[in-house]
Amino acid sequence: MSDHAVNTPVHAARAHGHRAPRAEFYVYFAVILLGAFPVAFVSWIVSTIRHRRLPKRGPFASAWFDAKAITPLIFRA
């Protein structure tokens, strides 16, 4: 008989879910951040002019948020 409790989905999820980010992840993150910053800056300027008040997030925070959301999607694919 085989032991089915050894590689349960719970153990597999724990083993693969908490990997330490590698250098490749940081390189992709930096490239995406550098690409997202000009777009976020223009968007921030347009929003400031349009609404006549400063948005809650600045352009760097917005670009950081976008890079933080996009980079893991690349590694999951």
Curated annotation (Swiss-Prot):
Keywords: Bacteriochlorophyll biosynthesis, Chlorophyll biosynthesis, Photosynthesis. The keyword Calcium does not apply. Disulfide bonds: none annotated. GO terms for biological process: bacteriochlorophyll biosynthetic process; photosynthesis. InterPro entries: PufQ_cyt-su. It comes from the Bacteria. It holds the Pfam family PufQ. Required for bacteriochlorophyll biosynthesis. Directly involved in the assembly of both the B875 and B800-850 pigment-protein complexes. Belongs to the PufQ family. This is Protein PufQ. It comes from Cereibacter sphaeroides (strain ATCC 17023 / DSM 158 / JCM 6121 / CCUG 31486 / LMG 2827 / NBRC 12203 / NCIMB 8253 / ATH 2.4.1.).
